[in-house]
Amino acid sequence: MTNPGTLPESIRYCVVGAGIHGLSTAWHLARELKARGTGSGDDIVVIEKSAAGAGPSGIACGVVRNNYFQPAMRELMAHSVEVWDANAEAFEYHPVGYLQISYDEMRDDVLTIHEQQKDIGYESEFIDGEAETHAYMKGIFDDWRATGVSSVLHEKKGGYAHNMATVNGLLAKVQAEGVTVVSETLVTELVVDGGAVTHVVARRGVESSVIAVDHVIAAAGPWVPKLWEMLDLPDTTDIVSGGTTHTVPTWKFWALQEGTLDVDPGYLMNNAGDMPPVVHVDADATLCDEDGNVLVDGKWGIYYKPDFNFGGVQGGYMPYPVEKPWRDVAIDPYGPASPDFVVGEDFRAVWAAALSHCQSRFEGKAHLMSREPSGGIGAFTPDSFPVFDTFCDNVYVIADSNHGFKMVGVGALVAKELVGDVQGLLEPFRYSRYSLGKLHPESNSPYPWS
């Protein structure tokens, strides 16, 4: 192990990014190398441009769910939930379950999810019908009153985790394995020679270092497009669908909308006085504020939970696309420090109204919406699903398309691939799926990632 904060002159594995994926990969890779007698954490360095969890991982809502229409996503998330369950205390993970409450158009999709969850042994319950949905939700929250919904998928596994507690838990595991984590250091160049990356150039302050590498793991969240560009990979991607080829930008950004209602988290306990499941509602009822003004005339979706980490009822609303080429998007400063991508009054009004639409306890509470800056952006792939694949012979790209925080187990699978064991759970997420037309099915959810 090199001294903390010191870059090595050469290293076998260089991980770029100290968020969920970078840290999980480093931790699991160190364990894989040790178990096989082929190395240890001393063979790995993690380079982070700021500090661990300074990107989306550190501001994430922390929801852990299996609710995906795509079979490959469900199977991948079932694996990650096992990792969450096995490390619940270290990651401050709360397995309270997850509720997907949906409108009519989503009914068949959600029923399919339930049926296929049974096939993979992921426990859930499906409630069908408007009256049945209302009765089921009243059994959890006696003030439930949402309209425009007619089914419930109740996942008995899943829940949520405290974001920075999870990051710090992973960081402790990484450092316990002897991995060096270097912060405040920016990767400025990936030197390609003979089709592979031979050196990583990194700058700390005004000093640059050149590191000889055998493998690079690009796990930089919304900064992955910058690493992609360093590798001279394509700006556009050809997608084959229905016998037709469509050329689309490889990367696009979406702005995330999350916030907190400043009430005691205990305000959202269930009828038994216990922590409730995470609530996700997709409705097609007109959404109005307390004065009767129409805020949304059409489909909308929110998610929320009591959260002692955020200090209130925390959650979010549908993201919106950033309508400009990715190079024109100011990724930094990231998150709440951004002058461009923090939520405004429109979000606060809609989210507070949606809470009140669902539960009467939130009526008249719009003025309690936190004014603390919140928000962030995510780099999305051409189909809004992850890409996990090797490029330039020795660069493993983890592009999670903003599904990331919940996928804490992806690092375990990537680690196995880095030592030569191809993982079936990752096969559906290769970049080649676009040109081969092996696309994930699309749901009727108003969200781009469900």
Per-region residue spans from a language model:
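Short beta-strand to alpha-helix junction loop
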Residues: 71, 75-76, 101-109, 153-173, ...
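Glycine-rich FAD pyrophosphate-binding loop
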Residues: 30-57
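Beta1/beta-strand and adjacent pyrophosphate-binding region of the FAD-binding site
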Residues: 5-21, 45
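A conserved beta-strand/loop element that lines the FAD pocket in flavoprotein oxidoreductases
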Residues: 175-188
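C-terminal catalytic lobe of FAD-dependent flavoproteins
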Residues: 321, 325-331, 342-450
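Dinucleotide-binding Rossmann-like beta1-alpha1 core, especially the glycine-rich loop
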Residues: 61-140, 149, 301-302
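Helix-loop-beta segment of a Rossmann-like dinucleotide-binding subdomain
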Residues: 7-10, 92-100, 134-178, 197-201, ...
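Flavin-dependent oxidoreductases
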Residues: 24, 65, 190-341, 364, ...
